[in-house]
UniProtKB/Swiss-Prot annotation:
The lineage of its organism: Eukaryota, Metazoa, Chordata, Craniata, Vertebrata. Its main location: cytoplasm. Residues 16-140 form the MH1 domain. This is Mothers against decapentaplegic homolog 9. It comes from Rattus norvegicus (Rat). The gene is Smad9. Phosphorylated on serine by BMP (bone morphogenetic proteins) type 1 receptor kinase. Phosphorylated by activin type I receptor-like kinase-2 (ALK-2).
Length: 434
């Protein structure tokens, strides 16, 4: 034996089956991790007749139909590979198809898959060609009226103000995921308390194109509208950290579609992490200190296919106030949703936002400036760690919670800004008392 040969190498052995499967591996990072992941899989598949052959067939002929390749589902649904836990279908899709895959939110099963991860059966399909990657939908441009053709009966401003004045609670309502969401079948009708947005179908076809049957019924022509397109910004969101009502540290600009906000310290300045443990505050009290110790792994934000997800990876719950999420589930706009450890919730949907914006523009014309401006509130998400706020807590407002963050969604905000610029000045000046 050569004196420099490590002892561990004498006992390391990669089976021919593992070597064969690694031949289809995508990317060149984390070789050892991929090898251990494949080795773990081979040991499971060897117990099932024909499973190895089916996997090799799927990998070697990606365009051809293939059967499910399954492994038993663990208690928490995750698989541990070399001190790292992950969902099995995500792990093997990362190994054999998409090395940059971050989350299960980026995957959708094909119709041919009988054991997709989301079905929660005893077996889980890990065939990477039984899943597809979620694509970001292209949002149609919204059409901004050029002229002031105000019809009081079409205006939503009065309804908006009436609902805001009479239905805004002294303290926000509370909801817990997933319990409060199980009866939710989508947005509530417009007459329900707190709902100030229209609920008519999205008018994606306005104004009518020339020659269409209903052209004579439409009061508008193409020249009456100016299209404003959605553009994806370089940084999809920014995150500001607060302790009570004090901003602490610099704002974090998120360029990666997967961002971890935790309570640890990471001096490497990783662009995918916002480490709250690094931030100092001379006014910090014992309650804040104790809360910061419980943030732990914090929250994982994913921006996938035009949707934003928040996954609680802390041992303690997180609390989220998202008007977009509340509208989608039929809650009051100010409702605070509790996300327990290990759960994830969709907190923003670009397509829903686009529909609301298009509806407001179509129905309220000139006097809808204030109503459209109100949509800026939907582009901000507030989230507290460990301690909640609202009607069920002694803290009435997010600024009473020890540790919280405010997330600004740049794409929707910039889109709104362009729309409002095209609309011109508001009928009533926007102010703190408007």
């Amino acid at each position: 034996m050569h004196p420099s040969t490590p002892i561990s190498s004498l006992f390391s052995f990669t089976s021919p089956a593992v070597k064969r499967l690694l031949g289809w591996k995508q990317g060149d990072e984390e070789e050892k991790w991929a090898e251990k992941a494949v080795d773990s899989l081979v040991k499971k598949l060897k117990k099932k007749k024909g499973a190895m052959d089916e996997l090799e067939r799927a990998l070697s002929c990606p365009g051809q139909p293939s059967k499910c390749v399954t492994i038993p589902r663990s208690l928490d649904g995750r698989l541990q590979v070399s001190h790292r836990k992950g969902l099995p279908h995500v792990i093997y899709c990362r190994v054999w198809r998409w090395p940059d895959l971050q989350s299960h939110h980026e995957l959708k099963p094909l119709e041919c898959c009988e054991f997709p991860f989301g079905s929660k059966q005893k077996e889980v399909c890990i065939n990477p060609y039984h899943y597809r990657r979620v694509e970001t939908p292209v949002l149609p441009p919204v059409l901004v009226p050029r002229h002031s053709e105000y019809n009081p009966q079409l205006s939503l401003l009065a309804k908006f103000r009436s609902a805001s004045l009479h239905s805004e609670p002294l303290m926000p309502h509370n909801a817990t995921y997933p319990d409060s969401f199980q009866q939710s079948l989508g947005p509530a009708p417009p007459s329900s308390p707190g709902h100030v947005f229209p609920q008519s179908p999205c008018p994606t076809s306005y104004p009518q194109s020339p020659g269409s049957p209903s052209e004579s019924d439409s009061p508008y022509q193409h020249s009456d509208f100016r299209p404003v397109c959605y553009e994806e910004p370089l940084h999809w969101c920014s995150v500001a950290y607060y302790e009570l009502n004090n901003r602490v540290g610099e704002t974090f600009q998120a360029s990666s579609r997967s961002v971890l906000i935790d309570g640890f310290t990471d001096p490497s300045n990783n662009r995918n992490r916002f480490c709250l443990g690094l931030l100092s505050n001379v006014n910090r009290n014992s309650t804040i200190e104790n809360t910061r110790r419980h943030i732990g792994k914090g929250v994982h934000l994913y921006y996938v296919g035009g949707e934003v997800y928040a996954e609680c990876v802390s041992d303690s719950s997180i609390f989220v106030q998202s008007r977009n999420c509340n509208y989608q589930h039929g809650f009051h706009p100010a409702t605070v949703c509790k996300i327990p450890s290990g759960c994830s919730l969709k907190v923003f949907n670009n397509q829903l936002f686009a529909q609301l914006l298009a509806q407001l523009l179509a129905q309220s014309v000139h006097h809808g400036f204030e109503v459209v401006y109100e949509l800026t509130k939907m582009c901000t998400i507030r989230m507290s760690f460990v301690k909640g706020w609202g009607a069920e807590y002694h803290r009435q407002d997010v600024t009473s919670t020890p540790c919280w963050i405010e997330i600004h969604l740049h794409g929707p905000l910039q889109w709104l800004d362009k729309v409002l610029t095209q609309m011109g000045s508001p009928h009533n000046p926007i102010s703190s008392v408007s």
